[in-house]
Design a protein with these regions (language model features):
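Domain-core detector
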Residues: 1-182, 192-289, 293-301, 313-334, ...
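A short, surface-exposed interaction/processing loop segment used at functional sites
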Residues: 363-394
Length: 394
Protein backbone atom coordinates (compact mmCIF):
# COMPACT_ATOMS: atom_id res chain seq x y z
CA UNK A 1 0.00 0.00 0.00
CA UNK A 2 1.28 3.45 -0.95
CA UNK A 3 0.58 6.58 1.12
CA UNK A 4 -1.90 7.78 -1.53
CA UNK A 5 -3.70 4.42 -1.51
CA UNK A 6 -4.01 4.55 2.27
CA UNK A 7 -5.60 8.00 2.09
CA UNK A 8 -8.05 7.07 -0.69
CA UNK A 9 -9.01 3.85 1.14
CA UNK A 10 -10.30 5.82 4.11
CA UNK A 11 -14.05 6.26 4.29
CA UNK A 12 -15.53 9.75 4.40
CA UNK A 13 -16.58 10.61 7.95
CA UNK A 14 -18.58 13.82 7.70
CA UNK A 15 -19.45 15.00 11.19
CA UNK A 16 -19.88 18.22 13.19
CA UNK A 17 -17.66 16.77 15.93
CA UNK A 18 -14.90 19.04 17.20
CA UNK A 19 -11.23 18.14 17.53
CA UNK A 20 -11.64 17.30 21.22
CA UNK A 21 -14.49 14.90 20.38
CA UNK A 22 -12.38 13.14 17.76
CA UNK A 23 -9.44 12.93 20.17
CA UNK A 24 -11.67 11.16 22.70
CA UNK A 25 -12.39 8.38 20.21
CA UNK A 26 -9.97 5.46 20.23
CA UNK A 27 -7.41 5.20 17.41
CA UNK A 28 -8.92 1.94 16.18
CA UNK A 29 -12.08 3.80 15.19
CA UNK A 30 -10.39 6.88 13.73
CA UNK A 31 -7.96 4.87 11.62
CA UNK A 32 -10.37 3.98 8.82
CA UNK A 33 -11.96 7.42 8.60
CA UNK A 34 -11.00 10.50 6.60
CA UNK A 35 -12.22 13.43 8.65
CA UNK A 36 -11.50 16.97 9.74
CA UNK A 37 -12.97 18.55 12.86
CA UNK A 38 -16.41 20.19 12.30
CA UNK A 39 -16.52 19.26 8.57
CA UNK A 40 -20.00 17.76 8.21
CA UNK A 41 -20.30 17.93 4.41
CA UNK A 42 -19.13 14.73 2.69
CA UNK A 43 -18.67 16.58 -0.61
CA UNK A 44 -16.02 18.81 0.95
CA UNK A 45 -14.33 15.82 2.54
CA UNK A 46 -14.27 13.97 -0.79
CA UNK A 47 -12.31 16.80 -2.42
CA UNK A 48 -10.00 17.07 0.59
CA UNK A 49 -9.30 13.33 0.46
CA UNK A 50 -8.53 13.40 -3.26
CA UNK A 51 -6.31 16.50 -3.01
CA UNK A 52 -4.38 15.10 -0.03
CA UNK A 53 -3.83 11.80 -1.87
CA UNK A 54 -2.46 13.67 -4.89
CA UNK A 55 -0.02 15.55 -2.66
CA UNK A 56 1.09 12.22 -1.14
CA UNK A 57 1.71 10.77 -4.62
CA UNK A 58 3.47 13.90 -5.87
CA UNK A 59 0.77 14.76 -8.42
CA UNK A 60 -0.16 18.03 -6.69
CA UNK A 61 1.76 20.65 -4.76
CA UNK A 62 0.37 21.83 -1.44
CA UNK A 63 -0.59 25.18 -2.97
CA UNK A 64 -2.50 23.44 -5.79
CA UNK A 65 -4.27 21.25 -3.23
CA UNK A 66 -5.30 24.32 -1.23
CA UNK A 67 -6.75 25.87 -4.39
CA UNK A 68 -8.81 22.76 -5.20
CA UNK A 69 -10.19 22.55 -1.67
CA UNK A 70 -11.05 26.26 -1.60
CA UNK A 71 -12.97 25.86 -4.88
CA UNK A 72 -14.98 23.03 -3.32
CA UNK A 73 -15.70 25.09 -0.22
CA UNK A 74 -16.91 27.99 -2.37
CA UNK A 75 -19.15 25.72 -4.46
CA UNK A 76 -20.79 24.28 -1.35
CA UNK A 77 -21.49 27.74 0.05
CA UNK A 78 -18.92 27.77 2.82
CA UNK A 79 -18.45 31.08 4.61
CA UNK A 80 -16.14 31.25 7.64
CA UNK A 81 -17.49 32.77 10.85
CA UNK A 82 -16.44 36.42 10.90
CA UNK A 83 -14.64 36.10 14.23
CA UNK A 84 -12.79 32.93 13.10
CA UNK A 85 -11.64 34.12 9.67
CA UNK A 86 -8.01 33.27 8.92
CA UNK A 87 -7.62 31.00 11.95
CA UNK A 88 -7.66 27.24 12.44
CA UNK A 89 -11.46 27.18 12.68
CA UNK A 90 -11.73 28.74 9.21
CA UNK A 91 -11.77 25.79 6.77
CA UNK A 92 -10.54 28.02 3.94
CA UNK A 93 -7.55 29.52 5.77
CA UNK A 94 -4.01 28.52 4.85
CA UNK A 95 -3.36 27.49 8.46
CA UNK A 96 -6.28 25.04 8.50
CA UNK A 97 -5.67 23.69 5.00
CA UNK A 98 -1.96 23.19 5.69
CA UNK A 99 -2.89 21.31 8.86
CA UNK A 100 -5.29 19.04 6.94
CA UNK A 101 -2.89 18.39 4.06
CA UNK A 102 0.36 18.03 5.98
CA UNK A 103 -1.04 15.94 8.85
CA UNK A 104 -2.79 13.45 6.56
CA UNK A 105 0.16 13.12 4.18
CA UNK A 106 2.61 12.66 7.06
CA UNK A 107 0.32 10.08 8.72
CA UNK A 108 0.00 8.03 5.52
CA UNK A 109 3.74 8.10 4.89
CA UNK A 110 4.44 7.26 8.53
CA UNK A 111 2.04 4.31 8.35
CA UNK A 112 3.67 2.85 5.24
CA UNK A 113 7.15 3.29 6.68
CA UNK A 114 6.01 1.66 9.93
CA UNK A 115 4.82 -1.44 8.08
CA UNK A 116 8.09 -1.64 6.15
CA UNK A 117 10.23 -1.03 9.25
CA UNK A 118 8.53 -3.63 11.44
CA UNK A 119 8.83 -6.61 9.10
CA UNK A 120 10.83 -9.57 10.45
CA UNK A 121 13.89 -8.75 8.34
CA UNK A 122 13.79 -5.03 9.17
CA UNK A 123 13.55 -5.72 12.92
CA UNK A 124 16.55 -8.06 12.76
CA UNK A 125 18.74 -5.39 11.11
CA UNK A 126 17.21 -2.29 12.72
CA UNK A 127 15.52 -3.31 15.98
CA UNK A 128 15.31 0.24 17.36
CA UNK A 129 14.51 3.74 16.24
CA UNK A 130 15.22 7.24 17.49
CA UNK A 131 12.82 10.13 17.94
CA UNK A 132 14.40 13.02 16.02
CA UNK A 133 13.47 16.50 14.87
CA UNK A 134 12.93 16.56 11.12
CA UNK A 135 11.53 20.10 10.84
CA UNK A 136 12.33 23.23 12.81
CA UNK A 137 9.70 25.05 14.85
CA UNK A 138 9.59 28.59 16.29
CA UNK A 139 8.34 27.30 19.62
CA UNK A 140 9.22 23.57 19.75
CA UNK A 141 7.65 21.33 22.35
CA UNK A 142 9.97 19.84 24.97
CA UNK A 143 10.06 16.35 23.50
CA UNK A 144 12.77 14.99 25.83
CA UNK A 145 10.46 15.81 28.76
CA UNK A 146 7.46 14.30 26.96
CA UNK A 147 9.56 11.22 26.22
CA UNK A 148 10.74 10.77 29.80
CA UNK A 149 7.29 11.57 31.16
CA UNK A 150 5.92 8.54 29.33
CA UNK A 151 8.66 6.22 30.57
CA UNK A 152 11.15 6.62 27.72
CA UNK A 153 14.88 6.22 28.35
CA UNK A 154 17.63 8.59 27.18
CA UNK A 155 20.81 7.02 25.78
CA UNK A 156 23.73 9.40 25.28
CA UNK A 157 21.30 12.31 24.99
CA UNK A 158 19.23 10.47 22.37
CA UNK A 159 15.63 9.25 22.56
CA UNK A 160 15.97 5.62 21.41
CA UNK A 161 13.70 2.62 22.00
CA UNK A 162 12.83 -0.73 20.47
CA UNK A 163 10.36 -0.39 17.63
CA UNK A 164 8.07 -2.70 19.60
CA UNK A 165 8.18 -0.49 22.72
CA UNK A 166 4.88 1.00 23.95
CA UNK A 167 6.56 4.42 24.20
CA UNK A 168 5.80 5.16 20.54
CA UNK A 169 2.05 4.90 21.07
CA UNK A 170 2.27 6.61 24.46
CA UNK A 171 3.80 9.83 23.07
CA UNK A 172 1.34 10.02 20.16
CA UNK A 173 -1.63 12.35 20.29
CA UNK A 174 -3.26 10.10 17.69
CA UNK A 175 -2.67 6.74 19.39
CA UNK A 176 -0.39 5.45 16.60
CA UNK A 177 3.19 4.14 16.95
CA UNK A 178 4.27 6.04 13.83
CA UNK A 179 4.72 9.77 13.11
CA UNK A 180 3.37 12.38 13.21
CA UNK A 181 3.06 12.22 16.97
CA UNK A 182 1.20 15.54 17.30
CA UNK A 183 -0.16 18.34 15.13
CA UNK A 184 2.75 20.28 13.65
CA UNK A 185 5.29 18.60 15.93
CA UNK A 186 8.10 18.48 13.38
CA UNK A 187 9.24 15.18 14.91
CA UNK A 188 9.98 11.93 13.08
CA UNK A 189 11.94 8.71 13.52
CA UNK A 190 15.32 7.38 12.38
CA UNK A 191 16.24 3.70 12.19
CA UNK A 192 18.89 2.54 14.66
CA UNK A 193 20.87 -0.54 13.57
CA UNK A 194 21.58 -3.50 15.84
CA UNK A 195 25.27 -2.66 16.41
CA UNK A 196 24.48 0.95 17.26
CA UNK A 197 21.71 -0.12 19.64
CA UNK A 198 24.11 -2.52 21.42
CA UNK A 199 26.77 0.20 21.66
CA UNK A 200 24.34 2.57 23.36
CA UNK A 201 23.08 -0.14 25.69
CA UNK A 202 19.53 -0.18 24.39
CA UNK A 203 19.79 -3.94 23.82
CA UNK A 204 22.32 -6.62 24.83
CA UNK A 205 24.55 -8.43 22.35
CA UNK A 206 22.77 -11.74 22.99
CA UNK A 207 19.24 -10.32 22.78
CA UNK A 208 17.19 -11.93 19.99
CA UNK A 209 15.61 -9.66 17.37
CA UNK A 210 12.33 -8.19 18.63
CA UNK A 211 9.09 -9.54 17.22
CA UNK A 212 6.11 -7.39 16.45
CA UNK A 213 2.87 -8.95 17.75
CA UNK A 214 0.36 -9.43 14.90
CA UNK A 215 -2.15 -7.12 16.59
CA UNK A 216 0.38 -4.27 16.40
CA UNK A 217 0.79 -4.61 12.64
CA UNK A 218 -2.48 -3.07 11.45
CA UNK A 219 -4.25 -4.68 8.52
CA UNK A 220 -6.05 -1.88 6.73
CA UNK A 221 -8.28 -4.37 4.94
CA UNK A 222 -9.87 -5.53 8.20
CA UNK A 223 -12.76 -3.80 9.93
CA UNK A 224 -11.24 -1.94 12.85
CA UNK A 225 -12.80 -2.00 16.28
CA UNK A 226 -11.88 -0.56 19.65
CA UNK A 227 -13.24 -0.15 23.14
CA UNK A 228 -15.17 2.96 24.04
CA UNK A 229 -13.19 5.30 26.34
CA UNK A 230 -13.41 4.01 29.91
CA UNK A 231 -15.75 6.10 32.04
CA UNK A 232 -17.22 7.78 28.94
CA UNK A 233 -18.89 4.76 27.31
CA UNK A 234 -22.45 6.15 27.32
CA UNK A 235 -21.42 9.65 26.23
CA UNK A 236 -19.24 8.34 23.37
CA UNK A 237 -21.89 5.82 22.31
CA UNK A 238 -24.47 8.60 21.89
CA UNK A 239 -21.98 10.89 20.13
CA UNK A 240 -21.00 8.21 17.59
CA UNK A 241 -24.58 7.14 16.88
CA UNK A 242 -25.69 10.75 16.38
CA UNK A 243 -22.76 11.58 14.09
CA UNK A 244 -22.49 8.42 11.97
CA UNK A 245 -25.58 6.25 12.37
CA UNK A 246 -24.92 2.80 10.87
CA UNK A 247 -21.36 3.70 9.90
CA UNK A 248 -20.50 2.67 13.47
CA UNK A 249 -21.89 -0.45 15.15
CA UNK A 250 -21.72 -0.72 18.94
CA UNK A 251 -21.98 -3.88 21.03
CA UNK A 252 -21.41 -3.54 24.76
CA UNK A 253 -18.26 -1.44 25.22
CA UNK A 254 -16.91 -2.25 21.74
CA UNK A 255 -17.43 -0.06 18.69
CA UNK A 256 -16.60 -1.03 15.11
CA UNK A 257 -16.11 1.38 12.23
CA UNK A 258 -18.16 0.41 9.17
CA UNK A 259 -17.47 3.57 7.19
CA UNK A 260 -16.31 1.71 4.05
CA UNK A 261 -19.52 -0.30 4.05
CA UNK A 262 -20.83 1.23 0.81
CA UNK A 263 -17.64 0.60 -1.18
CA UNK A 264 -17.36 -2.95 0.16
CA UNK A 265 -20.94 -3.72 -0.84
CA UNK A 266 -20.47 -2.31 -4.35
CA UNK A 267 -17.47 -4.60 -4.76
CA UNK A 268 -19.61 -7.60 -3.80
CA UNK A 269 -18.36 -7.90 -0.23
CA UNK A 270 -19.44 -6.62 3.15
CA UNK A 271 -22.93 -7.09 4.51
CA UNK A 272 -25.97 -7.88 2.26
CA UNK A 273 -27.57 -4.63 3.38
CA UNK A 274 -26.52 -1.33 4.95
CA UNK A 275 -28.76 -0.10 7.74
CA UNK A 276 -28.50 3.69 7.77
CA UNK A 277 -30.86 4.13 10.70
CA UNK A 278 -33.65 6.60 11.31
CA UNK A 279 -33.89 10.04 9.77
CA UNK A 280 -31.68 12.70 11.32
CA UNK A 281 -32.92 15.96 12.78
CA UNK A 282 -31.46 17.78 9.77
CA UNK A 283 -33.53 15.66 7.36
CA UNK A 284 -36.72 15.98 9.42
CA UNK A 285 -36.32 19.77 9.38
CA UNK A 286 -36.31 19.75 5.55
CA UNK A 287 -39.58 17.81 5.20
CA UNK A 288 -42.65 20.05 4.96
CA UNK A 289 -45.30 17.34 4.54
CA UNK A 290 -46.53 16.26 7.98
CA UNK A 291 -47.42 12.66 7.00
CA UNK A 292 -44.04 12.11 5.34
CA UNK A 293 -42.27 13.67 8.31
CA UNK A 294 -44.07 11.25 10.63
CA UNK A 295 -42.98 8.26 8.53
CA UNK A 296 -39.39 9.51 8.39
CA UNK A 297 -39.29 9.89 12.17
CA UNK A 298 -40.64 6.38 12.64
CA UNK A 299 -38.82 4.32 10.02
CA UNK A 300 -35.18 3.95 9.09
CA UNK A 301 -33.51 3.31 5.73
CA UNK A 302 -31.86 0.05 4.67
CA UNK A 303 -29.81 -0.14 1.44
CA UNK A 304 -29.65 -3.66 -0.11
CA UNK A 305 -26.37 -4.63 -1.78
CA UNK A 306 -28.20 -6.02 -4.82
CA UNK A 307 -30.05 -2.70 -5.28
CA UNK A 308 -26.75 -0.78 -5.27
CA UNK A 309 -25.06 -3.15 -7.71
CA UNK A 310 -28.08 -3.04 -10.04
CA UNK A 311 -28.02 0.76 -10.11
CA UNK A 312 -24.24 0.82 -10.57
CA UNK A 313 -24.60 -1.36 -13.70
CA UNK A 314 -27.63 0.58 -14.93
CA UNK A 315 -25.80 3.90 -14.71
CA UNK A 316 -22.33 2.90 -15.92
CA UNK A 317 -22.81 5.14 -18.96
CA UNK A 318 -24.83 8.29 -19.73
CA UNK A 319 -28.49 7.53 -20.43
CA UNK A 320 -31.79 9.26 -21.05
CA UNK A 321 -32.59 12.00 -23.53
CA UNK A 322 -29.41 13.80 -24.50
CA UNK A 323 -27.47 11.86 -21.87
CA UNK A 324 -29.31 13.65 -19.07
CA UNK A 325 -28.55 10.85 -16.62
CA UNK A 326 -24.85 10.84 -15.77
CA UNK A 327 -22.81 7.74 -14.85
CA UNK A 328 -22.74 6.96 -11.13
CA UNK A 329 -19.29 6.66 -9.54
CA UNK A 330 -18.27 4.90 -6.34
CA UNK A 331 -17.95 8.37 -4.83
CA UNK A 332 -21.59 9.07 -5.68
CA UNK A 333 -22.71 5.93 -3.85
CA UNK A 334 -20.53 6.96 -0.89
CA UNK A 335 -22.69 10.07 -0.60
CA UNK A 336 -25.86 8.05 0.08
CA UNK A 337 -25.43 8.29 3.90
CA UNK A 338 -25.06 12.08 3.50
CA UNK A 339 -28.13 12.18 1.25
CA UNK A 340 -30.09 10.40 3.98
CA UNK A 341 -28.72 12.46 6.86
CA UNK A 342 -28.51 15.95 5.38
CA UNK A 343 -29.80 16.45 1.80
CA UNK A 344 -30.07 19.79 0.04
CA UNK A 345 -33.80 19.19 -0.36
CA UNK A 346 -36.44 16.63 0.63
CA UNK A 347 -39.81 16.53 -1.15
CA UNK A 348 -42.81 14.22 -1.19
CA UNK A 349 -42.88 11.99 -4.25
CA UNK A 350 -45.96 9.79 -4.33
CA UNK A 351 -47.68 7.99 -1.48
CA UNK A 352 -45.27 7.42 1.39
CA UNK A 353 -42.25 8.26 -0.74
CA UNK A 354 -39.58 10.89 -0.30
CA UNK A 355 -37.20 12.27 -2.90
CA UNK A 356 -33.84 13.50 -1.59
CA UNK A 357 -31.38 15.56 -3.61
CA UNK A 358 -27.79 16.67 -3.17
CA UNK A 359 -25.72 18.79 -5.54
CA UNK A 360 -22.30 17.36 -6.36
CA UNK A 361 -19.11 19.25 -7.10
CA UNK A 362 -18.79 17.95 -10.67
CA UNK A 363 -21.87 19.80 -11.88
CA UNK A 364 -24.45 17.13 -11.12
CA UNK A 365 -27.30 16.57 -8.73
CA UNK A 366 -27.88 13.22 -7.02
CA UNK A 367 -31.45 12.13 -6.40
CA UNK A 368 -32.42 9.27 -4.08
CA UNK A 369 -35.97 7.99 -3.91
CA UNK A 370 -37.01 6.39 -0.61
CA UNK A 371 -40.11 4.36 0.20
CA UNK A 372 -40.53 5.39 3.83
CA UNK A 373 -43.26 2.82 4.51
CA UNK A 374 -40.86 -0.01 3.65
CA UNK A 375 -37.66 1.79 4.63
CA UNK A 376 -36.00 0.96 1.31
CA UNK A 377 -34.60 2.98 -1.62
CA UNK A 378 -36.44 3.06 -4.93
CA UNK A 379 -34.38 5.09 -7.40
CA UNK A 380 -30.93 6.65 -7.55
CA UNK A 381 -29.62 8.76 -10.39
CA UNK A 382 -27.45 11.75 -11.21
CA UNK A 383 -28.26 14.53 -13.63
CA UNK A 384 -26.20 17.37 -14.96
CA UNK A 385 -27.21 20.82 -13.76
CA UNK A 386 -24.25 23.06 -14.60
CA UNK A 387 -20.73 23.14 -16.00
CA UNK A 388 -18.29 21.71 -13.43
CA UNK A 389 -15.26 23.67 -12.28
CA UNK A 390 -13.85 20.82 -10.24
CA UNK A 391 -14.32 17.09 -10.53
CA UNK A 392 -13.68 15.00 -7.41
CA UNK A 393 -12.59 11.42 -7.89
CA UNK A 394 -15.05 8.70 -7.01
Amino acid sequence: MTPAERILAKALAASPMKSADWSSIQAGLRDRAFFSATVDDARRLAVMREAVAKVASGDLSESQARLEIREALEQTGYTPPQDKKGGLQDLSSQRRLDLIIQTNVAEARGYVRYLEGTSEGALAAFPCQELVRVQGRKAPRNWPEIWKGHGGQIYGGRMIALKTDEIWTAISRFGHPWPPFDFGSGMGVRDVGRREAIRYGVIAADDPPPKMPPEKRPNFNENLADRLPKGREKETDLMLREAFGAQVSIEGDMAKWNGSLIRDMLAGGGTPRARLGRASGALIARIEDEDIRSLAEKNGLTIPRQWMQTHALKHEKPSGKGGANLPLSTGDFELIPSLWRCPDSATRHGDGELELSLETLDGGILTLGVNLSKGTPTTFHKRKTRAPSHSPKG
